[in-house]
Amino acid sequence: MAKALATAQRRGQIGDMDMPPSPDPFGIDSLDALESLYDTPSELVRGKVGGRIDAVTARFIAASPFVLLGTQGQRGIHITPRGDPAGFVAVVDEQTLILPDRRGNNRIDALRDILEDDRVSLLIMVPGGGETLRVHGHARITTDPALRARHVAQGREPTSLLVIRVTSLFMQCAKALMRSKLWDGRARPEGLPSMGQLMASQVPGLVESASMDSTYPERIRSTMY
C-alpha cells in the first residue's frame, strides 16, 4: 500500500495533502501523557473561574472594542471577529450580554452554528491591556426591534443580535500578548481595572487585590518562557 501511494505521488496522481498521516512517534494520545508534560496548575489558577458579570468585570467589557466569538455546529468549529467602538458589547445584568451582528460577508457561519448548538465562547480584548477575558455561555439570536434600535452604529441597525447567557468567565494572563508584542507602544487605558481588581471581584475571597497587583508583573516576567 505504501509503495503504491508513493508511486502515485511521484506520478502526480495525488498530492501531499491527500496522503494519509504518518504515525507520530512523539504524539500525545492520552490525558496521562499530556498532564505529565506540564506542571500542576496552582490553586489560584484552578479557582479563578467566576459565574457572573460583576461591576468591575463590566468595566473591562465596556472598554473593549474587539472580541473573538467561538461557535460549533454540524459544519465544524468557527471563530469570528467582532468589533465596534468600545462598549458595543452590552452588559444587561450579571448573567447576560448582548452582541450586535453587523454587516459582513453573509456566510453567517457563527449564526448557523448557534441554531444547532447554542454554546459559545468569547475572548474579550482591550487594546493596551495585556489581560483578556474569557466568557462561556449559551446564545440565542434575536431581531427584537427595540434592541436593534438601541444598538445603532453609523446610522445603521444591526441585522440581528446575540443574547448571551453567561455560565462562566475568567481572566487570562498577559503572557501571550506580551510575547506577541501586540500592544507594544500603546498605553494601558486609564481606569481599566487591574488583574488583581478583576480576579478579586470575580471570585471573592480568592485573592487580595493590592497584594496580587504588587506581585503580578514580576510573576509574569519570570514565567514568560
Model-derived features with residue positions:
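Binding-site signature for planar aromatic cofactors or substrates
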Residues: A2-Y225
